[in-house]
């Protein structure tokens, strides 16, 4: 390979390679580093990097209650059930819905995992991003979504934002809002969009939430948007309740035939969440969180090559990206303290520096 490096490239600039120097494939790699001037800054992140089979961070999450709505009807309520249906494994949050074998869970066919950040981490506006995958099967009904911290107006008046849903065996993602205007009055439609994917693969699902617009992306490609109307008739009927704090919910549920089909009691449903992150612009909205002052720049990150991998050391929470020499990102996450990353032999790039792993 011949390499042509462009440093400090600015938006709109181009780079040309002479045709007579190209013989075969051309590989283009881009690396973007935070410099403090980026539009969106990381405000909150959970990388789910706790010990295997530990529970999600209690400073941010708690288990959802079991209630009558379809998605909540099987939610685990015992410590044993919660341990089996929402736990950390291999740097992922594992949410499951499985056959109920625990007498203390009561007379329910299945038990399901569902966690939420209400009263602990809630925010107004920003970019919410999650990397996730699910296991398509008849009755599958997982979700990554937002509900209002103040729900005194009740559902759907107070609003709901479904960042991502998938049902049954469909290779499709759904992105939806629910309000009094859309659900009860059937106005201000369409309120939902979808895009085709391979549901069994990991995808990065993103929601951009501004005072006037909701925009969904799947793997960086715009999938759907929903705007605040300027019609007083619709605003008076609750078309836009999205100007106050919402919290996160991550869950693996199953259908009852109303949308997703009836569940397969003998199947183990599973959805994995690799990470959840919140970015905001300076001065944009508020965030209340048990995790404060996450820094993305100006904090030291030391990197050491060791046998079989890299040691990353950061006194303060610092976002780290590790790339192979070909430009493939092999790690992206927060580092605080000491973190060893197992890697195969080769050359890697961290914070703009090449490091050899032997």
Residues of each region from the PLM?
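Conserved aromatic beta-strand anchor motif in extracellular beta-sandwich/beta-rich domains
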Residues: 1-3, 216-218, 322-327
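Surface-exposed interfaces of beta-sheet-rich extracellular modules
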Residues: 1-16
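Short, exposed beta-strand/loop patches in secreted or surface proteins that constitute
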Residues: 8, 83-88, 301-305, 333
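C-terminal outer-membrane/trafficking sorting elements
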Residues: 292-358
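Extracellular Ig-like/FN3 beta-sandwich strand-entry sites
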Residues: 23-25, 125, 200-202, 345-347
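Solvent-exposed segments in extracellular or luminal domains encompassing
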Residues: 14-24, 339-344
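Low-complexity, Pro/Thr/Ser/Gly/Ala-rich linker/spacer regions in secreted
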Residues: 10, 27-42, 280-299
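GH16 jelly-roll
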Residues: 35-287
